Amino acid sequence: MSNLTGTDKSVILLMTIGEDRAAEVFKHLSQREVQTLSAAMANVTQISNKQLTDVLAEFEQEAEQFAALNINANDYLRSVLVKALGEERAASLLEDILETRDTASGIETLNFMEPQSAADLIRDEHPQIIATILVHLKRAQAADILALFDERLRHDVMLRIATFGGVQPAALAELTEVLNGLLDGQNLKRSKMGGVRTAAEIINLMKTQQEEAVITAVREFDGELAQKIIDEMFLFENLVDVDDRSIQRLLQEVDSESLLIALKGAEQPLREKFLRNMSQRAADILRDDLANRGPVRLSQVENEQKAILLIVRRLAETGEMVIGSGEDTYV
């Protein structure tokens, strides 16, 4: 079997385990690795019984070794990847895997901390460090932490998030040193997180007044960047432009009480948009509730609108709702 490369062995194994399992394996590979294996697979004309038997025997042997209690998982993983992908690609993939693993516990710690405690922990760091940390957090947690900063720091950090392009190698050592202290020795990976989409998602979760102030601050620095962020945002009032079928799908997911409170702060055209996509009975009940429900706090209205927007974003990402043509500008 000495004439078989690691890629050849991987192809034989993938063709042996069946289409469904092979597809699952591909989901965990990079685009380049998928292309390499696919190209090799396309060139396969015949696999001898001996080649098949040898590859399966080697795989079984290594799988049994992996099951031993004294196995070094990292060394085993490195060995398997080198055999399958070659030294260079294996090193790159393993680095990504281990960095992602190391990132998780430190970031999860911040995700589960009270926003005030997390804000106190990082507020004195350089704004770029803060931005780098926040892009790795859940969007709602990042928004809550930003809300606790003073306006100047909040605007500075948000601008850095919007222009974030990953951690440059030259800055990695300094960043790691800071995070070693803040996050109990865990490192943030050099990632492609951040950027306009991340900024828009975080701003969408801020209070309306803070949203407007942040957008204004970014616009003063870079008008084009501010517009890109706005284009990525989707505001509650923009639902008036969504097609009826999408509204009907949204109504299947939204709690009636949540919708009632959200619409208390909406203009009449948007109210009518929802009403005409309901059954007659449901529409009549909602009209009565809107007319008879007393005043509702603005903060409560905003919270329900933002909760509905999270559902909108989820449905849009799965293709169950259409929220814009790509040419629309939301302001």
Curated annotation (Swiss-Prot):
GO terms for molecular function: cytoskeletal motor activity; identical protein binding. It is a peripheral membrane protein. SUPFAM superfamilies: FliG. Keywords: Bacterial flagellum, Cell inner membrane, Cell membrane, Chemotaxis, Flagellar rotation, Membrane. The record marks 160 as: Part of the EHPQR-motif. It is found in: Cell inner membrane; Bacterial flagellum basal body. A motif (Part of the EHPQR-motif) lies at residues 125-128. Changing residue 292 to W: Decreases binding to YcgR, significantly improves motility in a pdeH disruption mutant. GO terms for biological process: bacterial-type flagellum assembly; bacterial-type flagellum-dependent cell motility; bacterial-type flagellum-dependent swimming motility; chemotaxis. One of its GO terms (cellular component) is bacterial-type flagellum. Forms dimers and other homooligomers. Interacts with MotA via residues in its C-terminus. Interacts with flagellar brake protein YcgR. NCBIfam families: fliG. Belongs to the FliG family. FliG is one of three proteins (FliG, FliN, FliM) that forms the rotor-mounted switch complex (C ring), located at the base of the basal body. This complex interacts with the CheY and CheZ chemotaxis proteins, in addition to contacting components of the motor that determine the direction of flagellar rotation. This is Flagellar motor switch protein FliG. It comes from Escherichia coli (strain K12).
